[in-house]
């Protein structure tokens, strides 16, 4: 059985990155797909760099250092991974990882850390903190976030089973996507 693990990015040693490492420890032959990654961070996590596949964002100017500026193309980028050769896809998602394209004969399990906060429950706070609540730029930002919100909801139906990292996140998955989730607390 071929397994792929999908994560948004591996650029810091954070909670979701440690979850990816824990999943990779259970499935050591799995390949890891991520939008961008730092070799040093993968080394710190004990993730084999040769198993890591990055998206085209990795090669864009400041793609690794300032990857968040490419938010508008994250959905497009995650859909470019060709996962046809895998039987099982396990996404560790707090943004777009769950949106990978899969086939009907593949099993997609999403370990969800959160629905995308900046397009759902923290939308207005995100705009204010980013200085995008008012002015000309706000219209473009709101339009982009609106498009990502629609994509996020549609992409939630690509997941066969949701696992939440807490009961609270499980309730947010139910409220946002109208999908049930089983809670498995992270062992990190």
Outline where the language-model segments fall.
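Active-site proximal beta-strand in glycosyltransferases
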Residues: 88-91, 102-133, 182
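Carbohydrate-associated surface elements
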Residues: 168, 187
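Glycosyltransferases and closely related glycan-assembly transferases
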Residues: 77-88, 96-109, 113, 161, ...
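Short amphipathic alpha-helix
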Residues: 16-26
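Short beta-strand scaffold positions
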Residues: 91, 163-164
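Active-site donor-binding segments of glycosyltransferases and PAPS-dependent sulfotransferases
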Residues: 26-98
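Membrane-proximal helix-turn-helix segments that form the acceptor-binding/catalytic region
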Residues: 131-162, 170
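Nucleotide-activated donor-dependent transferases that construct or modify glycoconjugates
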Residues: 1-13, 35-36
């Amino acid at each position: 059985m071929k397994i792929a693990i999908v994560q948004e990015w591996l650029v810091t040693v954070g909670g979701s990155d440690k979850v990816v490492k824990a999943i990779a420890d259970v499935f050591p032959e799995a390949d890891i797909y991520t939008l961008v990654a730092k070799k040093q961070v993968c080394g710190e996590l004990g993730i084999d760099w040769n198993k890591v596949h990055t998206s085209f964002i990795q090669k864009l100017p400041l793609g690794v250092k300032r990857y968040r500026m490419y938010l508008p193309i994250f959905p497009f980028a995650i859909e470019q991974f060709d996962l046809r050769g895998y039987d099982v896809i396990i996404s560790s998602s707090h943004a777009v990882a769950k949106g990978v394209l899969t086939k009907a004969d593949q099993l997609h399990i999403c370990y969800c850390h959160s629905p995308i906060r900046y397009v759902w429950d923290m939308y207005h706070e995100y705009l204010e903190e980013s200085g995008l609540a008012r002015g000309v730029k706000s219209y473009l930002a709101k339009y982009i976030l609106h498009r990502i919100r629609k994509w996020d909801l549609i992409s939630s139906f690509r997941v066969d089973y949701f696992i939440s990292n807490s009961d609270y996140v499980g309730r947010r998955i139910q409220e946002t996507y109208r999908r049930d989730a089983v809670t498995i607390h992270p062992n990190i």
